[in-house]
UniProtKB/Swiss-Prot annotation:
A GO MF label: DNA binding
Name this polypeptide is given: Virion-associated protein
GO CC entries: host cell plasmodesma; virion component
Biological source species: Figwort mosaic virus (strain DxS) (FMV)
Pfam families with a match to the protein in the record: Cauli_DNA-bind
Subcellular location: Virion; Host cell junction, Host plasmodesma
TM annotation in the entry: none
Amino acid sequence: MAATLSEIRELIQSLTKTANEIKAMLERNSAGKPTGIEEAAAKIIKDIGDKIDQCECTKKIEEMLDQKQNADTQIVPTKQESSGLVKYSYPNWNVGNEELGSSGNPNAVKWPPRK
């Protein structure tokens, strides 16, 4: 179902024209009494809402929310924050800062040099 650019352009132009016509009708009929367009829009919104309510995924979400026992329980677990300072996972024998970890190699290069 591939559409060419010309087909898409024509579709966009027709949608733009329809949208402009709807805007003009709404501006003319903004006196406060409901029009056929507003009634049709309300029906469409209600139908979409009903379909969402009947969806299995909505029922599953509602069940999961009902199973939630207290405010501390989370449905989706949060990622634990890692500390900003991570120890090296490979041997860096006394290289760098002491806080970053070291295996204690006595022949390692140390900075700043010690006498």
